[in-house]
From Swiss-Prot:
Protein role: Catalyzes the conversion of 7,8-dihydroneopterin to 6-hydroxymethyl-7,8-dihydropterin. Can also catalyze the epimerization of carbon 2' of dihydroneopterin to dihydromonapterin.
Protein's recorded name: Dihydroneopterin aldolase
Chemical reaction(s) catalysed: 7,8-dihydroneopterin = 6-hydroxymethyl-7,8-dihydropterin + glycolaldehyde; 7,8-dihydroneopterin = 7,8-dihydromonapterin
Keyword terms of this UniProt record: Folate biosynthesis, Isomerase, Lyase
Entry GO MF terms: dihydroneopterin aldolase activity; isomerase activity
Length: 121
């Protein structure tokens, strides 16, 4: 099955990070979510109950990123993936990519970040 739902470029303000500046000032986190889902049922029925409502996924991700602080974005990504996999039974696999576009570290780059993939048990 190669069907996916994706939510790319979601931008949220949060206070995640190891450095004091990240906790005090905060920063924008760019989150991309890719969900492996069998979309054939929704393709036939034209009914949202046969898919994953990405509006609801957006609200969930927003709540997590704008909620309690994580020191590591690895931990933040795990929280997101775990929530999605436990709340959406149609999801077979969740990929979470988190980018910090302007972390308080020296250098020139478009962003730094992580990506995890977690299967739904």
């Amino acid at each position: 099955m190669n069907d996916i739902i994706f939510l790319n470029g979601m931008r949220f303000y949060g206070y995640h990070g190891v450095l004091a500046a990240e906790n005090d000032i905060g920063q924008i986190f760019v989150v991309d979510i890719t969900l492996k889902v069998d979309l054939s049922y929704a393709g036939q029925s034209d009914d949202v109950k046969d898919t994953v409502n990405y509006g609801e996924v957006y609200k969930d991700v927003k709540s997590i990123v704008e909620g309690p602080r994580s020191c590591l974005i690895e931990h933040l990504a795990e929280r997101i993936a775990k929530h999605i996999n436990s709340h959406y039974n149609r999801v077979m696999e969740t990929k979470v990519r988190i980018t910090k576009e302007n972390p308080p570290i020296p250098g020139h780059y478009d962003g730094v970040g992580i990506e995890i993939v977690r299967e739904n048990d």
